[in-house]
Amino acid sequence: ASYKIHLVNKDQGIDETIECPDDQYILDAAEEQGLDLPYSCRAGACSTCAGKLLEGEVDQSDQSFLDDDQVKAGFVLTCVAYPTSNATILTHQEESLY
């Protein structure tokens, strides 16, 4: 399956909808489609790529950085997040984690 992922951040001038297969990380799909999103480790072990899920669902079981409260609040590490539905993600949210 493939899902539509709406990536948005007014401050960064981002308002794009990408196609993302359910077996591809959202960060990788965004890069393939020409979007320049922040990242560092690409392994789910830091917060550089963090976004916030505004709607929809992802599988980010590969991540090891976010705590349960942050996950419940909707934070998502785009470098290890597979989409499980159409979703809207607010990008560049590392600073909001703290």
Swiss-Prot record:
Q: How does it assemble?
A: Forms a complex with heterodimeric ferredoxin-thioredoxin reductase (FTR) and thioredoxin.
One Pfam family name is Fer2
User: Residues in domain 2Fe-2S ferredoxin-type?
Assistant: 3-95
Species: Cyanidium caldarium (Red alga)
Protein name per UniProt: Ferredoxin
Query: How is the cofactor bound, as the UniProt entry phrases it?
Result: Binds 1 [2Fe-2S] cluster.
What keywords sit in the KW lines? 2Fe-2S, Chloroplast, Electron transport, Iron, Iron-sulfur, Metal-binding, Plastid, Transport
- A GO MF label: electron transfer activity
Question: Which PROSITE patterns does the UniProt entry name for this protein?
Answer: 2FE2S_FER_1, 2FE2S_FER_2
